[in-house]
């Protein structure tokens, strides 16, 4: 569980300390107030990649520190890394940043012990799971659906899948060996001589990744146009959501439009769908601006690297011309002839022995694939039942979900494809998830999946949601709020939201805002000169009912009118009643 977070000189944060509690922790504030920057900080703390502009402008160093509570399992893992938990059974995770010239350096520590990113990655899986905006799109990938099913099946299924991977590799090797050995002896010797030459050339080229050519071309283009890209990304960021000019950014204009439509919708509810469209557009524009800014932050001129890239491209071009035409085909060709070479050098093994080996390998593969299929079928039934149980309370009472296994040729991942079929409405045929689910339905589907997997995760793990409720309202928003509250009874949740229905159920509520301060240390009372003014992020715990009522009213209608305040008060009263009922 995340107990506290301390941030100094990160992005727009000058100095911040925030304490989190058990249950549902909610962050609210105006669009663009910097709520997601906190999630970026947590991501960086636990090994995320740092961009060139991670430090606050004008600062040469910064730090992010998180204090987490530990569990018996986590303490055992720490012991394997020679790290002792603190006396109060907590762990302090710290990431320090320093800038020297144009380079940014960072160091990570656990309870004062220096650690690498691999250790942080292992720790991250035990401490937090971040559900970012846009993650619903990953659910549409059949490979991701198969992976989710296998993870839900637990250790038994994963071990059987690994056995299939091993036997499939043995099968392909046996097949290649038989084919190679069927050649005549004279051909074998001639072939060996030819393969020796080709393998030497391919080995010297050090081919490892089939995507290297495309990646190098992209890198070459990027390195050749760094200055242009920096300028364009800065301009795009300004246009999208961080304008420093008199002309407002697109996000500002959309925010104004959202405010106008919210007011209009109070008088005409038929405008709510239009309001939702504008809100969705605003969220996407802000996310696009943030990604463009991150892209620009990571750009750096490197002439030496550009020379290395161009030299490497010449080598790969020659290899592809001879063994391709693509690099992937060249690598596959190298693997193929290496296996063929290894078999041709073993002249003692007879054709009959190779045939017998292939037959045994095929039988073994079919056996393991069949066993994996049976486990997946049972797991699919459990996932169907469990996911429907989680979806029904999310305003999807008539939902149908089928995890279908479609037979395919045996491969390294088994003998079936996994496809999620879904029908959210009565009378509608089930269709693949990618063909039928709307944005709001995908958000609920993802939340239901998280609920299913939360039972498999350690209770000490913190679930972080970045606007999981985006694009929904009314009954659906209330259902999502209730589900988040339910999850928070088992695990700590940290949610960024614009939904008053979610915020009302918070066990701890924080308001995020941007403020402008005067940094003229010598004379703070000096007339505010532009160069002394800085924008910083502030976070305020909302501890009184009055403060929370005002915040919920802002989320509801964008102002503190009587109706909004009354609605906010009713939400708080209902939340208190739910909390009291859950404790009985």
UniProtKB/Swiss-Prot annotation:
Keyword terms of this UniProt record: ATP-binding, DNA damage, DNA repair, Nucleotide-binding
Highest rank taxon of the organism: Bacteria
GO molecular function, one term: ATP binding
Any one GO BP annotation for this protein: DNA recombination
Disulfide bond sites: none
CDD domains per the UniProt record, alphabetical: ABC_RecN
GO cellular component, one term: bacterial nucleoid
TM helices/strands, residue ranges: none
Residues involved in ATP binding: 29-36
A Pfam family assignment: SMC_N
Function (record text): May be involved in recombinational repair of damaged DNA.
PANTHER family referenced in this protein's UniProt entry, alphabetically: DNA REPAIR PROTEIN RECN (PTHR11059:SF0)
Family (UniProt): Belongs to the RecN family.
Name this protein carries in UniProt: DNA repair protein RecN
Protein's organism: Synechocystis sp. (strain ATCC 27184 / PCC 6803 / Kazusa)
């Amino acid at each position: 569980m995340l107990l506290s977070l301390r941030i100094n000189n990160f992005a727009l944060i000058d100095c911040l300390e925030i304490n989190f509690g058990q249950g549902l922790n909610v962050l609210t504030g105006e669009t663009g107030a910097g709520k997601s920057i906190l999630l970026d900080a947590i991501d960086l703390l636990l090994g995320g990649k740092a961009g060139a502009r991670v430090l606050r402008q004008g600062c040469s160093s910064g730090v992010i520190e998180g204090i987490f509570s530990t569990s018996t399992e986590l303490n055992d893992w720490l012991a394997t890394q020679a790290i002792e938990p603190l006396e109060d059974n907590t762990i302090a995770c710290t990431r320090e940043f320093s800038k020297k010239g144009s380079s940014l350096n960072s160091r990570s520590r656990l309870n004062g012990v220096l650690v690498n990113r691999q250790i942080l990655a292992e720790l991250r899986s035990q401490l937090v799971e971040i559900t970012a905006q846009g993650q619903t799109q990953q659910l549409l990938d059949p490979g991701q659906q198969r992976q989710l099913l296998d993870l839900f099946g637990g250790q038994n299924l994963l071990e059987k899948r690994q056995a299939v991977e091993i036997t499939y590799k043995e099968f392909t090797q046996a097949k290649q060996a038989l084919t190679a050995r069927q050649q005549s002896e004279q051909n074998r010797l001639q072939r060996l001589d030819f393969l020796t030459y080709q393998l030497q050339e391919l080995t010297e080229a050090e081919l490892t990744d089939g995507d290297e050519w495309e990646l190098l071309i992209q890198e070459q283009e990027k390195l050749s146009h760094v200055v242009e890209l920096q300028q364009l990304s800065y301009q795009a960021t300004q246009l999208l959501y961080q304008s420093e000019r008199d002309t407002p950014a697109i996000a500002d204009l959309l925010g104004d439009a959202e405010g106008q439509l919210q007011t209009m919708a109070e008088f005409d509810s038929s405008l709510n769908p239009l309001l939702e469209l504008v809100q969705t557009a605003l969220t996407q524009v802000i996310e696009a601006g943030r990604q463009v800014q991150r892209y620009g932050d990571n750009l750096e001129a490197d002439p030496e690297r550009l020379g290395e890239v161009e030299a490497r491209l010449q080598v790969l071009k020659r290899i592809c011309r001879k063994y391709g035409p693509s690099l992937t085909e060249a690598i596959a060709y190298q693997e193929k002839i290496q296996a063929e070479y290894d078999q041709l050098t073993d002249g003692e093994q007879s054709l009959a022995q190779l045939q017998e080996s292939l037959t045994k390998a095929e039988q073994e593969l079919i056996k393991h694939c069949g066993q994996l299929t049976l486990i997946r079928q049972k797991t699919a039934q459990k996932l169907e039942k469990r996911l429907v149980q989680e979806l029904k309370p999310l305003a999807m009472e008539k939902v149908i979900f089928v995890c279908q296994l479609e037979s395919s040729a045996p491969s390294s991942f088994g003998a079936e494809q996994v496809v999620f079929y879904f029908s959210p409405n009565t009378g509608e045929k089930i269709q693949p998830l990618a063909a039928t689910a709307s944005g709001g339905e995908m958000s609920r589907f993802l939340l239901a999946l998280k609920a299913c997997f939360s039972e498999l995760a350690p209770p000490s793990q913190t679930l972080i949601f970045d606007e999981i409720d985006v694009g929904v309202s009314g009954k659906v928003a209330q259902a999502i709020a209730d589900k988040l509250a339910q999850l928070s009874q088992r695990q700590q949740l940290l949610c960024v939201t614009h939904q008053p229905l979610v915020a009302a159920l918070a066990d701890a509520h924080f308001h995020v805002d941007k403020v402008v301060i005067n940094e003229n240390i010598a004379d703070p009372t000096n007339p505010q000169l532009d160069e002394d003014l800085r924008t910083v992020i502030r976070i305020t715990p909302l501890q009184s009912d009055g403060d929370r009522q005002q915040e919920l009213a802002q989320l509801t209608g964008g102002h503190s009118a009587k109706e909004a305040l009354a609605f906010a008060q009713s939400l708080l009263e209902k939340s208190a009643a739910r909390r009291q009922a859950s404790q009985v």
